[in-house]
């Protein structure tokens, strides 16, 4: 059994695995994919002994029995995602898989008959299908609007067929295989070469579908092209996807939402490979990359939900079916009892042999707390294309988590938000990211597609908590250019007193460079950690700099006086996302630090900030999302934007402090006022010092040299004193 340390240690030398040039499908009996003959025997003998497993199985059985009562319904394809025919075919493929499983475990032939009848109906219909009548613009399908859904149908349905194949007559097998499985495998592979060979989650689903079909049908050719690409050279296919789509830390370049989605084909196909060709040692490939990917997917969450960076729907979390199945497989391999903590939080069990092991271990009380770590997740196949930094302090669901997005673009699903950040605290998202503009499978909202506002708003830089120059998005909104560049990670540090991530972006705009350092600081006299943010920007030409902060909560007050637009609200701008923001208030600010305070649930948050710049034209803008949205596609959001005009240089410095407690039931409030008295910033010879003065007379001194030499001594004159430190950064708390 692989040790947990082996899996998590990203510095371990890669395990060299030789992959045979030609696949040799084993002669295993059926089922032989995700569930094996031995699994069936184990489940049948003991599933009622484990409450979690029995509850899940009985629930699935009840649901399937109700579905079966409706009869075999296989409509001709008509609707796009979210429409009736689309959803019915989705229900059908899940029913085929579940019926096959229940037939194996219970021996009740009604499940075999139902799965068989569904598959025979598809075998009769599929050969007559052309392109879907509501086909998607790219990679259209036949049964579904896009070929991606076709691949998902095959991944599920072939598992159901695997479970019933030994109970079918020869002519029934021939009809099903020649009518639907082989034609669909052909359509997804040789007839869709661009998608099949693509290093992308759509390609992963396609190769998994075709490869799993090959294992069940005993077709070496289907397995080999799935593993090595259509030309069998290894330049495409599953093995190349394992090489390219995950970083050495297990981070998927499109971000957590699509990492979650891609887990299913990766893990299920790998399980099928392990079952049929264990000599490949697929779960050890590339230094256990698939196991790391599952751990990383968990780490990319807070309070049960994934970080909504890039194209992401914010209601997706660790209870998603993809992670339920993946966790069971990884637990079976590692025996890591901290994964049981996640399994219990998921609230459901994978109905597989691996899921039985999870249920058994939970029932035996083996659960240990999962360790949500502060980690740096390198991006790109070699881990050298930027990184995602996750800093955590505290325990449980209410701990604080700071996310610094210093990653590569993330291909077509990426957003133009270099050096963006998010903050979580007290179980909530405090500094927020919009995610994607989409109502998945809600046909009334543009057929469930990504909305136009995904491009006009959600992907634009102004929709994020990062620097905007001259109201233009990063890379001027061009994804091809954006894919060529990534931030430079300058430093990552995780200590007891403070944590730090720092990165530089020099390509987002012509003639502009900006560096951002985010710190999570423990201050003994404060109840909660504080966030310190230092963003320096320099430009060749005088420019307008905007730095948004999207915050979640009800505004309490500002230290600055705002000018309200009483009679009319106007758009903040005309394009690049600005056209979707209503300008509510404006306020001129100067060189002294200012503050905004809001409340969320029972906790207050104060954002103290100061901007160092030669420009005398500084303003704070308060805006709301919703302009130019006639179809009400956009959620409400509020934003504080710090604007500097006609400047070549600016340093945006801020401190975010959680404080106090409000109890509406008891009608009590404590600590409603910020503990931060002022924020001061000094820059000298490319070094920064930030002094956070607290009301109790103490202060926090943050020093940044941007020099990685840990022995190099640095000095900055801050007022009447000289601040000295060694290395890239220093944080000192000085008591009164």
Curated annotation (Swiss-Prot):
Residues at the catalytic site: 258, 413
Residue positions binding substrate: 136, 146-149, 198, 202, 257-260, 438, 667
Cofactor: Zn(2+)
Practical applications according to UniProt: Could be used as the key enzyme to produce alginate monomers in the process of utilizing alginate for biofuels and chemicals production.
Co-factor binding comment: The zinc ion seen in the crystal structure is located far away from the active site and likely plays a structural role. However, it seems important for enzyme activity since the mutation of one of its coordination residues causes a high decrease in activity.
Major localisation: periplasm
Disulfide-linked positions: none
Cross-referenced InterPro entries: Alg17C_C (IPR055076), Alginate_lyase_dom (IPR008397), Chondroitin_lyas (IPR008929), Hepar_II_III_C (IPR012480)
Site positions (Neutralizes the sugar carboxylate group at subsite +1): 201-202
Result of altering residue 149 to A: 1600-fold decrease in catalytic efficiency
Compartment(s) of residence: Periplasm
Gene Ontology MF: a single term: exo-oligoalginate lyase activity
Outcome after substituting residue 450 to A: Complete loss of catalytic activity
Reactions this protein catalyses: Cleavage of 4-deoxy-alpha-L-erythro-hex-4-enopyranuronoside oligosaccharides into 4-deoxy-alpha-L-erythro-hex-4-enopyranuronate monosaccharides
Complex formation: Homodimer.
PANTHER family assigned: HEPARIN-SULFATE LYASE (PTHR39210:SF1)
Family recorded in the similarity comment: Belongs to the polysaccharide lyase 17 family.
Identification of the protein by name: Exo-oligoalginate lyase
The species this protein was found in: Saccharophagus degradans (strain 2-40 / ATCC 43961 / DSM 17024)
């Amino acid at each position: 059994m692989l040790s947990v340390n082996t899996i998590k240690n990203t510095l371990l030398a890669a395990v060299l695995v030789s992959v045979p040039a030609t696949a040799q499908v084993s002669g295993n009996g059926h089922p032989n994919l995700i569930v094996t003959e031995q699994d069936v025997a184990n489940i049948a003998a003991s599933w009622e002994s484990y409450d979690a497993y029995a509850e899940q199985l009985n629930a699935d059985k009840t649901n399937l029995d109700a579905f079966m009562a409706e009869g075999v319904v296989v409509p001709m394809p008509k609707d796009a995602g979210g429409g009736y025919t689309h959803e019915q075919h989705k229900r059908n493929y899940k029913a085929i898989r579940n019926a096959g499983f229940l037939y194996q475990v219970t021996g009740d032939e009604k499940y075999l008959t139902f799965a068989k009848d569904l598959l025979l109906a598809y075998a009769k219909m599929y050969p007559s299908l052309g392109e879907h009548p509501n086909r998607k613009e790219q990679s259209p399908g036949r049964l579904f609007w896009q070929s991606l859904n076709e691949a998902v149908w095959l991944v599920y349905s072939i598992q159901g067929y695997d479970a019933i194949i030994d109970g079918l007559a020869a002519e029934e097998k021939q009809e099903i295989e020649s009518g639907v499985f082989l034609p669909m495998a052909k359509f997804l592979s040789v007839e869709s070469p661009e998608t099949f060979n693509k290093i992308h989650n759509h390609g992963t689903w396609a190769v998994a579908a075709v490869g799993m079909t090959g294992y069940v049908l005993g077709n070496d050719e289907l397995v080999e092209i799935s593993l090595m690409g259509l030309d069998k050279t290894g330049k495409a296919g599953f093995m190349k996807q394992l090489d390219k789509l995950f970083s050495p830390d297990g981070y998927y370049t499109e971000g957590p939402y699509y990492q979650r989605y891609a887990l299913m084909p990766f893990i299920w196909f790998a399980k099928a490979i392990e079952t049929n060709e264990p000599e490949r040692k697929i779960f050890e490939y590339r230094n256990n990359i698939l196991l790391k990917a599952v751990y990383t997917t968990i780490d990319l969450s807070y309070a049960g939900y994934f970080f909504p960076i890039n194209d992401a729907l914010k209601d997706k979390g660790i209870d998603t079916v993809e992670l339920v199945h993946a966790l069971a497989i990884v637990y079976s391999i590692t025996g890591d009892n901290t994964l049981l903590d996640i399994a219990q939080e998921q609230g459901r069990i994978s109905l597989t042999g691996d899921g039985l092991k999870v249920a058994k271990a939970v029932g035996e009380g083996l659960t240990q707390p999962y360790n949500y770590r502060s980690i740096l997740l390198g991006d790109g196949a070699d881990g050298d294309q930027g990184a995602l930094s996750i800093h955590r302090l505290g325990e449980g669901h209410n701990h604080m988590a700071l996310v610094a997005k210093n990653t590569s673009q993330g291909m077509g699903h990426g957003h133009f938000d270099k050096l963006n950040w998010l903050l979580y605290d007290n179980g909530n998202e405090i500094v927020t990211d919009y995610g994607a503009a989409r109502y998945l499978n809600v046909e009334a909202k543009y057929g469930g597609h990504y909305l136009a506002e995904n491009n006009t708003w959600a992907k634009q830089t102004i929709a994020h908590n990062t620097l905007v120059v001259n109201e233009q998005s990063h890379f001027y909104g061009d994804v091809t250019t954006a894919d060529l560049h990534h931030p430079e990670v300058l430093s990552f540090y995780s200590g007891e007193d403070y944590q730090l991530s720092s990165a530089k972006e020099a390509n987002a705009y012509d003639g502009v460079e900006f560096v951002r350092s985010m710190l999570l600081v423990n201050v003994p006299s404060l109840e909660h950690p504080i966030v310190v943010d230092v963003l320096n920007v320099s430009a060749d030409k005088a420019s307008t700099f905007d730095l948004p902060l999207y915050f979640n909560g009800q505004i309490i007050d500002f230290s600055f006086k705002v000018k309200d637009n009483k009679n009319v609200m106007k758009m903040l701008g005309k394009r690049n996302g600005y056209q979707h923001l209503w300008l509510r208030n404006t306020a001129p600010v100067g060189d002294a630090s200012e503050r905004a305070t809001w409340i969320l649930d029972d906790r207050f948050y104060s954002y103290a900030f100061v901007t160092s710049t030669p420009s005398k034209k500084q303003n704070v803008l308060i805006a709301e999302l919703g302009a130019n949205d006639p179809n009400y596609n956009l959620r409400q959001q509020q934003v504080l934007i710090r604007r500097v005009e006609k400047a070549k240089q600016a340093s945006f410095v801020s401190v975010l402090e959680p404080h106090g407690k409000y109890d509406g039931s008891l009608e009590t409030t404590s600590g409603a006022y910020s503990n931060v008295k002022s924020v001061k910033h000094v820059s000298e010879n490319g070094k920064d010092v930030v002094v956070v003065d607290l009301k109790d007379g103490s202060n926090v001194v943050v020093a940044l040299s941007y020099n990685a030499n840990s022995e190099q001594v640095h000095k900055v004159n801050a007022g009447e004193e000289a601040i000295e430190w060694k290395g890239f950064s220093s944080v000192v708390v000085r008591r009164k």
